[in-house]
């Protein structure tokens, strides 16, 4: 079996003056990443890949393992903020080709994420665990290959993610949190959600 742990980056600072790619982790985000990475699954990580966005690679650094960045692991490009529809978040799950002006659809994002994760999976040996630090929409886009995703509450960004009839998540994707993907013969056989967030 091979295991890929898809990790949503930890909590960034809130600063609308910075480009989204340059947002660093907040002090709380640093602590939260350390808490997540203290869990057993992360003791057996053999390799780490990260989005090049600062909040992602700053999260990856907390694993204390050398890592590579891959531009394909970046967050979904929202496009022109002036033309962003108020209902965009919900519409994207109704139509996976839906996109804002100059932005990416979930299908666009799924295509590049699938290529990146597929290459990572092919490079792994049985028994290995690889961590991939990326972003919530990018993770969801990839999971659409095997999962159904339903918007439960658009204003709160609450999703129901189902895999072969099993509920993987019914809530928000915490920052940080992880989806543990287990593969047999390079085919996805199970997904589990992992978070240290207190409800």
Q: Where do the protein language model's features map onto the residues?
A:
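Glycine-rich phosphate-binding loop signature in dinucleotide/nucleotide-binding domains
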Residues: 41-44, 120-128
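Beta-strand elements within well-structured catalytic alpha/beta cores of enzymes
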Residues: 3-8, 49, 127-138
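Generic structural signal for well-ordered alpha-helical scaffold segments
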Residues: 34-38, 114-122
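Acidic, low-complexity terminal tails and accessory targeting/binding regions
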Residues: 2, 75-87, 94-95, 126, ...
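Active-site signature of alpha/beta-hydrolase-fold catalytic machinery across serine-
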Residues: 62, 141, 145
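Conserved histidine-centered catalytic loops in small-molecule metabolism enzymes
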Residues: 41-71, 173-199
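Phosphate-handling substructures
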Residues: 63-115, 169-173
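Active-site-proximal alpha-helix that buttresses catalytic centers in soluble enzyme cores
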Residues: 2-68, 104-107
């Amino acid at each position: 079996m091979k295991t890929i742990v898809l990790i949503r980056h930890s909590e960034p600072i809130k600063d609308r003056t910075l480009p989204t790619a340059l947002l660093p982790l907040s002090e709380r985000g640093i602590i939260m990443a350390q808490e997540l990475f203290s869990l057993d699954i992360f003791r057996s990580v053999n390799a780490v890949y990260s989005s090049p966005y600062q909040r992602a690679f700053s999260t990856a650094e907390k694993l204390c393992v050398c890592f590579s960045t891959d531009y394909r692991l970046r967050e979904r490009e929202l496009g022109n903020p002036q033309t962003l529809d108020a209902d965009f978040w919900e519409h994207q799950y109704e139509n996976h080709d839906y996109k804002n002006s100059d932005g990416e659809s979930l299908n666009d994002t799924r295509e590049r994420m699938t290529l990146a994760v597929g290459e990572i999976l092919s490079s792994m040996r049985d028994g290995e665990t690889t961590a991939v630090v990326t972003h919530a929409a990018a993770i969801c886009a990839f999971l659409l290959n095997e999962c159904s995703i339903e918007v439960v509450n658009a204003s709160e960004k609450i999703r129901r993610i189902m895999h072969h009839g099993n509920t993987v998540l019914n809530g928000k994707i915490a920052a940080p949190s992880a989806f543990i993907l287990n593969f047999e013969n390079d085919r996805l056989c199970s997904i589990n959600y992992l978070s240290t967030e207190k409800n």
